[in-house]
């Protein structure tokens, strides 16, 4: 049966491909920056306990984003069969916390945490991780038709 309001369309999948390609470029730059600055971290003893350049995980994450972007570019033919979308269990979890009382309480707790941890949040790597989490979460949320309709309303777009 034809769904009049599909969660994914070819245009949405293709557009998200550009988002993930942009994220790839940003994180590839971050990996190069980390390599040039010479940042390292020590693995836990259970994994060998050796120093690893921090550019390594960033480069792997950037390659993962490139693969996700390529999947979006080449798989836009059958939107109903596309696998990279907001999981139903996560959508249900968000809906549980979206009622007014939980939303207010969670927003207040997060606001207090942001103020309390403000010195940690402004460190470059912490801010970069937060930006990545936000953009990937937005990319997944855009795969939901209802969310797309809410954020695309003229009163929500500058």
Q: What are the roles of these predicted feature ranges?
A:
Residues 36, 65-111:
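Membrane-interface helix-loop-helix modules in multi-pass inner-membrane proteins
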Residues 1-13, 82-85, 89, 145:
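Short, strongly hydrophobic alpha-helical membrane anchors
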Residues 140-156:
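Transmembrane helix-loop junctions at the membrane interface of multipass transporters and ion channels
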Residues 10-24, 57-59, 94-108, 156-158:
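Alpha-helical transmembrane segments of polytopic membrane proteins
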Residues 65-72, 132-141:
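Aromatic-anchored segments of alpha-helical transmembrane domains
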Residues 20-39, 101-116:
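Central hydrophobic cores of alpha-helical transmembrane segments in multi-pass inner-membrane proteins
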Residues 54-63, 121-133:
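Cytoplasmic-side transmembrane-helix entry/capping segments in multi-pass membrane proteins
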Residues 37-56:
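Membrane-interfacial, low-structure loops and terminal tails that flank and connect transmembrane helices
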């Amino acid at each position: 049966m034809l769904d009049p309001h599909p969660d994914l369309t070819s245009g949405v999948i293709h557009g998200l491909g550009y988002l993930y390609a942009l994220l790839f470029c940003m994180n590839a730059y971050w990996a190069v920056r980390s390599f040039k600055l010479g940042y390292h971290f020590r693995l836990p003893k259970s994994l060998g306990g050796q120093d690893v350049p921090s550019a390594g995980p960033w480069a792997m994450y950037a390659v993962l984003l490139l693969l996700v972007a390529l999947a979006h570019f080449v798989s836009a033919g059958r939107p109903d069969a596309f696998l990279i979308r907001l999981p139903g269990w996560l959508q249900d979890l968000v809906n549980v916390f979206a009622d007014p009382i939980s939303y207010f309480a969670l927003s207040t707790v997060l606001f207090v945490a942001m103020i309390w941890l403000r010195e940690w949040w402004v460190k470059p790597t912490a801010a970069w991780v937060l930006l990545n989490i936000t953009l990937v979460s937005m990319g997944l949320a855009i795969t939901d038709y209802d969310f797309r309709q809410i954020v695309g309303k003229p009163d929500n777009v500058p």
